Amino acid sequence: MNTPEHSELGKSSAYVDQYDASLLFPIPRLAKRLEMGVGATPIFFGADLWTAFELSWLNLRGKPQVALAQFIVPCETPNIIESKSFKLYLNSFNNTRFPDAAEVQARLRADISEAAWRGAPQASTVGVKLLLPEMFDREDVAELDGLSLDRLDVECSRYTPAPDLLSAVFDEPPVSEVLTSNLLKSNCLVTGQPDWGSVRIAYSGPQINQEGLLQYIVSFRNHNEFHEQCVERIFMDLWTRCKPVKLTVYARYTRRGGLDINPFRTSHPQAIPPNIRMARQ
């Protein structure tokens, strides 16, 4: 079984510039989910939205082509794709000739689907969209909608996940709120390098104490875990301690190595949000 410690993270890597799908390094989701109390059958739906800003290949005449790529990896896939391996894989397209962008898109979809669904009794596909240069000026930048928790002047002293900071009012009528923060920070599980993010929490149920929620978000500051795992941990802690009827947690992390990762988890089926980057991304 692939583990984070066996990946290329934190190691010197040769940059291959000829197409090589074997560079992708899938890591099973299950071990971390069991640690969080998720179990083999998650109670949430969702996906991991990736954006690749550094994708290039050669056309049949050897002329470089560029594009942005967006990926939707369903959270029911048994594996996440380790991000450095994703970067190395994308770099392997750099000096490889393809007849057109459609062939590149098809190759990306086939390879990433195989890695993400590897080991599943029934495999499916991931979503892949290429944005060519003539579409670049249509790309929007927008902030997360909702009431900002960052307006609160709270004292923060805990920098590892502290779910006991979460509380809700159970003896008052339920509410529906959308709360956001730009103060999410965690660290790479293997290298300890900082990962900076913003988070949007939408819920219906007992009103969540906002000061405690902000302190809880800040408590991830020194925590080592992958983006997807942090969002699932936030979801499970809120679900367990605050007992909402509906809950959605969506985080957008700043890019590293030309990639950003934006995990989305929700308690009820709904449309995946459009992959619109924020100013910090």
From Swiss-Prot:
Keywords: Cytoplasm, NADP, Oxidoreductase, Queuosine biosynthesis
InterPro entries, per the entry: GTP-CH-I_C/QueF (IPR043133), NADPH_dep_7-cyano-7-deazaG_red (IPR050084), QueF (IPR029500), QueF_N (IPR029139), QueF_type2 (IPR016428)
GO molecular function: preQ1 synthase activity
Binding-site positions, NADPH: 83-84, 256-257
Catalysed conversion reaction: 7-aminomethyl-7-carbaguanine + 2 NADP(+) = 7-cyano-7-deazaguanine + 2 NADPH + 3 H(+)
A single Gene Ontology CC term: cytoplasm
EC code: 1.7.1.13
Gene Ontology biological process: queuosine biosynthetic process; tRNA modification
Function field: Catalyzes the NADPH-dependent reduction of 7-cyano-7-deazaguanine (preQ0) to 7-aminomethyl-7-deazaguanine (preQ1).
The protein's assembly and partners: Homodimer.
NCBIfam families: QueF (TIGR03138)
Name the UniProt record assigns to this protein: NADPH-dependent 7-cyano-7-deazaguanine reductase
Lineage: Bacteria, Pseudomonadati, Pseudomonadota, Betaproteobacteria, Burkholderiales
